C-alpha cells in the first residue's frame, strides 16, 4: 500500500473531529443578495433600505416597509382599509377565487393588493398608494381600482400631490372585464387631478407590468423608476414568439426604458424620499407674496418704432 493510499483509506475510516462547537445561526440574521450572492447582516441591509451593500441590487420590499421609508414618522393615516374584494364572476381555476382571496388575506394580513393613505413627506402633505406584490402578484382588481381612485380624488380635494408606488403583474384575471375597467377609472381620476393643476408621481418598481403599465404607471408628470426594475406590458417570451426575433438582454429594464424615452429618471431607493421632496417643492404653486423682482434697466420701458 502506497503512502497516498494509506492516507486515502484513513480519511474514509476515521471521522474528522472538529475542535470547535457548531453554532446555530438564527433565521433572518443574514440575508443573501439575489444578484451577487453576498451575505449581509440583515440589520445593516435594513439600515440601507434593503439595497445590497456590495452590488447595489434593490431587494424586494412590501407596503409596510415602503410607507416607513417615505412617510414622516407619526403622520401616516390609512384610507379605505376595510374595502375588500368579492367574487362577482364565481371564478374558479384550481380553486375558487373566494378561497384564494381568503388564503391570501390570511397569509399577508392585507385586504387587497394596494394600501393607501395620507401623510407628510419631509413635512409636505401627500396622498400615497403602495402596491404590494405579495397579494396575488400585486394584480389590479376592482378594489385596487376603487382605492386608488378614492386616493387620487382625496389628493385632488386636499390639493396635495399623489404618489403611487407600482409593483404589479397586471390586471387580475379572476375579475375579468371588471379588472380591465379599472384602467380607465383610475386614468379618469388622474386626468381630473391634472386639470386641477396638481402633481402626480408614479414610482415604477420591480416588477411593473400588464394593465398597470398600460394605465396609471405611465401617466405621471414625471415617471420615476428604481434601478434594474422590470417594466413592460406583455412578457418577454410572448413578444419574442410574436416578433420571431431575439430581444436585447436589457429589454424591459428601467435603464432600457429610460434610454428610449419611456422613463424620465431612475432614482436609487436610498435617494428616493429626498428626490420626491425636492420635486414636490419645485411644483408647488407660487403664492402671491412670492413675486419675482423686476429687473432694473436703464433703457426706456417702450422702444420707439
From Swiss-Prot:
GO terms for cellular component: acetyl-CoA carboxylase complex. Zn(2+) binds at residues 33, 36, 52, 55. Pathway: Lipid metabolism; malonyl-CoA biosynthesis; malonyl-CoA from acetyl-CoA: step 1/1. A zinc finger (C4-type) spans 33-55. SUPFAM superfamilies: ClpP/crotonase. It catalyses: N(6)-carboxybiotinyl-L-lysyl-[protein] + acetyl-CoA = N(6)-biotinyl-L-lysyl-[protein] + malonyl-CoA. GO terms for biological process: fatty acid biosynthetic process; malonyl-CoA biosynthetic process. Pfam families: Carboxyl_trans, Zn_ribbon_ACC. It is an enzyme of class 2 (transferase). One of its GO terms (molecular function) is acetyl-CoA carboxylase activity. Keywords: ATP-binding, Cytoplasm, Fatty acid biosynthesis, Fatty acid metabolism, Lipid biosynthesis, Lipid metabolism, Metal-binding, Nucleotide-binding, Transferase, Zinc, Zinc-finger. Coiled coil: none annotated. Residues 29-298 form the CoA carboxyltransferase N-terminal domain. Binds 1 zinc ion per subunit. It is found in: Cytoplasm. Its EC number is 2.1.3.15. Transmembrane segments: none annotated. Its cofactor is Zn(2+). Component of the acetyl coenzyme A carboxylase (ACC) complex. Biotin carboxylase (BC) catalyzes the carboxylation of biotin on its carrier protein (BCCP) and then the CO(2) group is transferred by the transcarboxylase to acetyl-CoA to form malonyl-CoA. Acetyl-CoA carboxylase is a heterohexamer composed of biotin carboxyl carrier protein (AccB), biotin carboxylase (AccC) and two subunits each of ACCase subunit alpha (AccA) and ACCase subunit beta (AccD). Belongs to the AccD/PCCB family. This is Acetyl-coenzyme A carboxylase carboxyl transferase subunit beta. The gene is accD.
